[in-house]
Amino acid sequence: MIDSDGFRANVGIIICNRFGQVMWARRFGQHSWQFPQGGVDDGESAEEAMYRELYEEVGLKPEHVQILTSTRSWLRYRLPKRLIRQDSKPVCIGQKQKWFLLQLKSAENAIDLNASGHPEFDDWRWVSYWYPVRQVVSFKRDVYRKVMKEFAATTLPLQVKESNNRRRGMRRS
């Protein structure tokens, strides 16, 4: 769905583990890394699109994750001119995204990059929370910064809680 301003409706997905790290995935056959994301189909809610994309891109089902929060509004980025397909109608000049922060509830082996048979990614890893802001392609950087800042209040307490639990486990009686 492309709106009247030329922005395609899209969902972005940040999956975190119990340590507050986030899943970072490498685009298939490329050297670029990003969070899972994908378009919202006609008649589909943002949450429905998120669950569909979650399965298509990383093989996770609703029972594998818990929604922690989502962005208050849609965030936009413009595509570089070289990526705009002028011959498509309507012309898409960028994406408007609703972002979701999910916590992985299942074991990591539930992640399957080839679940749909058409992989978007060929590798993934856990990275520190702020790492993606510095590493994503430049035209997505502002949106990533805004999303990570908005979600920090939800995610960073996970890191503190787990760190405290590890310290308690290391104490000798």
UniProtKB/Swiss-Prot annotation:
GO terms for molecular function: mRNA 5'-diphosphatase activity. It comes from the Bacteria. Signal peptide: none annotated. GO terms for cellular component: cytoplasm. It is an enzyme of class 3 (hydrolase). One of its GO terms (biological process) is mRNA catabolic process. A motif (Nudix box) lies at residues 38-59. Gene3D superfamilies: Nucleoside Triphosphate Pyrophosphohydrolase. It holds the Pfam family NUDIX. Its EC number is 3.6.1.-. Belongs to the Nudix hydrolase family. RppH subfamily. This is RNA pyrophosphohydrolase. It comes from Shewanella halifaxensis (strain HAW-EB4).
